[in-house]
Amino acid sequence: MERAGPGSARPQQQWDQDSVEAWLDDHWDFTFSYFVRKGTREMVNAWFAERVHTIPVCKEGIKGHTESCSCPLQPSPRAESSVPGTPTRKISASEFDRPLRPIVIKDSEGTVSFLSDSDKKEQMPLTSPRFDNDEGDQCSRLLELVKDISSHLDVTALCHKIFLHIHGLISADRYSLFLVCEDSSNDKFLISRLFDVAEGSTLEEASNNCIRLEWNKGIVGHVAAFGEPLNIKDAYEDPRFNAEVDQITGYKTQSILCMPIKNHREEVVGVAQAINKKSGNGGTFTEKDEKDFAAYLAFCGIVLHNAQLYETSLLENKRNQVLLDLASLIFEEQQSLEVILKKIAATIISFMQVQKCTIFIVDEDCSDSFSSVFHMECEELEKSSDTLTRERDANRINYMYAQYVKNTMEPLNIPDVSKDKRFPWTNENMGNINQQCIRSLLCTPIKNGKKNKVIGVCQLVNKMEETTGKVKAFNRNDEQFLEAFVIFCGLGIQNTQMYEAVERAMAKQMVTLEVLSYHASAAEEETRELQSLAAAVVPSAQTLKITDFSFSDFELSDLETALCTIRMFTDLNLVQNFQMKHEVLCKWILSVKKNYRKNVAYHNWRHAFNTAQCMFAALKAGKIQKRLTDLEILALLIAALSHDLDHRGVNNSYIQRSEHPLAQLYCHSIMEHHHFDQCLMILNSPGNQILSGLSIEEYKTTLKIIKQAILATDLALYIKRRGEFFELIMKNQFNLEDPHQKELFLAMLMTACDLSAITKPWPIQQRIAELVATEFFDQGDRERKELNIEPADLMNREKKNKIPSMQVGFIDAICLQLYEALTHVSEDCFPLLDGCRKNRQKWQALAEQQEKTLINGESSQTKRN
């Protein structure tokens, strides 16, 4: 370093710290010699301490990340050694040695079935009751009755016999048995199981007549509603008596003894009625008659309870058979979600007798909406189509109830939608509902195995009466059965989605193999050359001018761009903080460079390098580095270099329209997802693992930021999110301490760096614009040739004269407000805004000149004509 002598007229040179550091970076031999000669033990210890990377005891360092793109880290198997969800053993193997009937049997036609033929069971014949008046034989009659009850489950036959036993005690003229039932609206009523049982009457005669009585109406209805017996001497004097039955049958009712039949929970399950006492006490029933009647009716309660258990078990058997058939159906078809849901909907419609079945699939990426809707009506059951049509008239499907059920995670049963006050309808909406003929509705959430997440909703409309075809309300049984149905429906959906995920993974593998066939890791010779050159000297950032927003790479070789990248990692303290080996860093940089296609005019390695350089300048010269964490800086630089990996020179729209395999992998940001996958592939490749010094948590965090940053370069996402960022800036509410706002800022910063070519000095901007136009015109040519479509003006080679005006429009619509907002965050980023404004003036002048030329040309042509 030269100094001015005492007598020299030349002033002493003033150097700031950055200039000294840059000079030391450029003169590595002197720096090394000075450190060896002047370095103290404290300096050496501090040097080591600066490079020691502390890893938490509970976290395990990553030496080689070989995880797939979709799942970067897998938890240790020992971490989940005890799974809470593991079912406990509830039956031992020895219990299967008991002589139970076969699970699967064949019926008379040889068809395999889960149900046994209950009609073929051998039953002991019912014995006729003995009507001895000897009280000593009453005990034997009771024992005989108990024996019959224990061996038979026919409610009608047993109750008929009980009434014949009762007749021997109380001697009434007629007996009737009414059972409590519920309709589809859960309203109770009474139906006669035995009517007018008399001495000498047969079972067939007593059970043929079926009468329905309303709840809490008449003598029987009153006893059923209040659960208290009635002993009426003269029926016609009681206002509760209904004489319509007498008028129909021509029978004269005098005295009535009516008693409730209760189960073990003291619930009324039936009502027994004795009519017209034959002898004694003036034709009225005595207290002894009441006691005897009540005693025998206790047996009726037992019979009804046992029979209900038996009927319930038969019903459950039949339900289980349907569910087993549904399970078999689900596992037969797992390839197509449309096919499996068509079969499920057809099963539900036919079994539950409903008009319409709609299955809504929740969007995994946006839980507030549905990704797919599958609708089927009973008229479609006879159609032979193998798939459900997704595209339907939106007016045919109502989303409001499904959205409500998805949010509440509880079933919804509406007997009449027009009368339900939870969903206010306007007159216009009511007309729409009437047009759709919606009356009763049952809607149930479809949950995953953990019961804490809704993956879909099943909606049934209009329960139909089998006999009359009229619409009725869904009852509790329908709710329970649909809840069981949707469990299997959820299994089918999840299995099919897993199958589709496997298919997507296979498509991803095909794309990866295609990429790997084109690309390869950096050659060892090239890596050694860069490593040797970097070990000798890497010029300072000032010398390389990579902290300038006006930086241009046109004069640099590819090897020099790699050296600049090493300097960026070094000056951002990433090499030191994360213990990156120079050999690994060199190979990773060259591998990234190699994975950019050379036949792409603009979106190649040079564009990625310029994006990273702008990011470096924003962090350093723009003073943003001190406002971010080391992991965020690391992720941003990696994302900037990798954000267009394996770009094919075409946009997302072309990928979709050409039906490229990449379009099968992602529903949005197709190329950006692919760029991230390529980034992970390189990071996980042997010799390229620059993140191996991170802990597991740091690795996860870094990958998350990298993915968010790369996806942020999709202009469609930028346009969707920028309004929130601009509003925060405008209202002075922007706060980098808020995690969401910080994520939003990093996304905006990535876009600003990606578009930074628009801020370069005019000669550089013109050259880059020519490269962009070349790439766009190549895509337009391919659209004409391969897709037979007329390209947009931006891609149309024949509209080249519109480039200046399109550039002005692009700056106004996309760029200008972004750089204004970025300048509000950091005033040191003003050169980006200033460059953008100056280039807009240049493009505006060219556009006006182009327009004048066009007008003059048209005028000259008119004069000639």
UniProtKB/Swiss-Prot annotation:
Swiss-Prot/TrEMBL catalytic activity: 3',5'-cyclic GMP + H2O = GMP + H(+)
Boundaries of every PDEase domain copy: 526-850
Enzyme Commission code: 3.1.4.35
PTM per Swiss-Prot/TrEMBL: Phosphorylation is regulated by binding of cGMP to the two allosteric sites. Phosphorylation by PRKG1 leads to its activation.
InterPro entries cross-referenced by the UniProt entry: GAF, GAF-like_dom_sf, HD/PDEase_dom, PDEase, PDEase_catalytic_dom, PDEase_catalytic_dom_sf, PDEase_CS
Binding positions (3',5'-cyclic GMP): Q807
GO molecular function: 3',5'-cyclic-AMP phosphodiesterase activity; 3',5'-cyclic-GMP phosphodiesterase activity; cGMP binding; cyclic-nucleotide phosphodiesterase activity; metal ion binding
Chain residues that bind Zn(2+): H607, H643, D644, D754
Residues carrying Phosphoserine: S92
GO biological process: cAMP-mediated signaling; cGMP catabolic process
Family (UniProt): Belongs to the cyclic nucleotide phosphodiesterase family.
Functional note: Plays a role in signal transduction by regulating the intracellular concentration of cyclic nucleotides. This phosphodiesterase catalyzes the specific hydrolysis of cGMP to 5'-GMP. Specifically regulates nitric-oxide-generated cGMP.
Name of the protein in question: cGMP-specific 3',5'-cyclic phosphodiesterase
Organism of origin: Bos taurus
